[in-house]
Amino acid sequence: VLSLSEPYNPEKYIDAIGICESAGMEVIIIDSISHCWDYLLDFHANLQGNSFANWAKVTPRQNAFIQRILNSSCHVICTMRSKQEYVLNERNGKMIPEKVGLKAVQRDNVDYEFTIVFDVNMKHYALASKDRTELFAGKAEFPLTEQVGMQILDWCNQCRTQPSVNYGTSYPAGRVAQ
């Protein structure tokens, strides 16, 4: 375990990923990347000058952090907090308030960068809101178990053994595959 302390800036996370890689770790779990986004929002709020222009000081730091996750030699699992809200659901003829997660506390569309995104509800059941592996797409909610982890690991290992594609050598310059 490599514990981070405040401030939770992107550079600290980037360094931590490097330390984990150097230590030979195969899997890194970052709990949570929402702390980094909160730091960047506070950083932005405290900058002087034009708020819109100040995003130019924030975005490269966020992008470097996400790229470091994506380019890691390790498997990286990230957690994110979600904004909470209550909804009323009918149960046995009564309206019961239930807490629901709405959106990840991170930059908009960050989920695009990940292979699988599980939304975990208050009962600790997961639903894949995004799944490039197609292992969990369209499935009803389920508990995250060791078996789920093994399915993901098997998928990762199958992808590792696929032959690499050498882009740009299959077709002469200027020609497009039909």
Residue ranges and their predicted role:
Residues 26-29, 80, 178:
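Generic low-polarity alpha-helical segments
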Residues 11-18, 134-152, 156-178:
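Interfaces that engage single-stranded nucleic acids at replication/repair/recombination sites
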Residues 1-67:
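Conserved inter-motif catalytic segment of the P-loop NTP-binding fold
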Residues 67-151:
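Phosphate-binding/switch region of NTP-binding enzymes
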Residues 20, 36, 74, 78, ...:
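Generic recognition of cysteine residues
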